[in-house]
Amino acid sequence: MRKIIVGSRSSKLAMTQTKWVIEQLKQAGAPYEFEIKNIITKGDRILDVTLSKVGGKGLFVKEIEQQMIDEDIDFAVHSMKDLPSELPTGLIIGATPSRVDARDALITTTGGGLDSLPEGAIVGTSSLRRGSQLLKLRPDLKIESIRGNIDTRLEKLKTGPFDGILLAAAGLQRMGWSEDIVSEYISTDDMIPAVGQGILAIECRANDQEVRDLLNLIHDQMTEKVAFAERSFLAAIEGSCHVPVGGFATINEDLSTTLVGFLGSVDGQQILLERETSLDPMQLGQTVATRLLDAGGREILASLPDDL
């Protein structure tokens, strides 16, 4: 019987997600033995610089993907929001389990929500998307970059200058911490999530049919549809960590997909939103992206500083 080697970052969240996937596969009847291989990525090593300055989304996956290409590991579990819109040749997303909470979560030092933050309060986030939309909601706030895994950011909230921090709700919930520490969940109407937020992407080699069949045991087609829509939108925008961009898709009763796309300026002064519904998720993402770009998005992208 083949042993399946699963690549994972070594953070608590990454390991929790990887172990969850393995457990789901076992519960679905997978007859394999599994072994987790920890892989340190560039994004894990560089913690004192904003993501966009050191390479953006691919920082957390390149080393893992190379080990997959080299056949040192068989598949890897990622937070989909960390995956670039284009994958290396020969690799595919083999499965997307059901999406969990896509919202952003605010954690404050006082336990109060967004409205309770005093004027000029400092909120930590490494996401230009979150910063832009937060400043739209509260122009008086000050945004400061904060890096590191969940534990590190929570510690910085206690010891640093921050009055609050913004994190993905999904990660906190997967760690089992959300009920104790989340001050407010920000509605997706007020803050469009990152593309793929709340979705696990299980990446594997396209030519490894055995692993593809295995991963299909926990694949959710509705989640795949919204992921297609959001990722095709991101690819058309050419979005990265350099761009305040977000996209959130939902499935309707008639199985059509509705996508809301967001593109904004770093200071939150310009916020562009487009909404469309289609039966074709891939085309939907491209349509929403084109409309955003035509509505002033190109000018926003051109005006973004190079040193973000």
From Swiss-Prot:
It comes from the Bacteria. Monomer. It catalyses: 4 porphobilinogen + H2O = hydroxymethylbilane + 4 NH4(+). Pathway: Porphyrin-containing compound metabolism; protoporphyrin-IX biosynthesis; coproporphyrinogen-III from 5-aminolevulinate: step 2/4. Tetrapolymerization of the monopyrrole PBG into the hydroxymethylbilane pre-uroporphyrinogen in several discrete steps. It is an enzyme of class 2 (transferase). Gene3D superfamilies: Periplasmic binding protein-like II (3.40.190.10), Porphobilinogen deaminase, C-terminal domain (3.30.160.40). GO terms for biological process: protoporphyrinogen IX biosynthetic process. The modification S-(dipyrrolylmethanemethyl)cysteine is found at residue 241. Its cofactor is dipyrromethane. The porphobilinogen subunits are added to the dipyrromethane group. This is Porphobilinogen deaminase. Belongs to the HMBS family. Keywords: Porphyrin biosynthesis, Transferase. Its EC number is 2.5.1.61. It comes from Exiguobacterium sibiricum (strain DSM 17290 / CCUG 55495 / CIP 109462 / JCM 13490 / 255-15). One of its GO terms (molecular function) is hydroxymethylbilane synthase activity. The gene is hemC. GO terms for cellular component: cytoplasm.
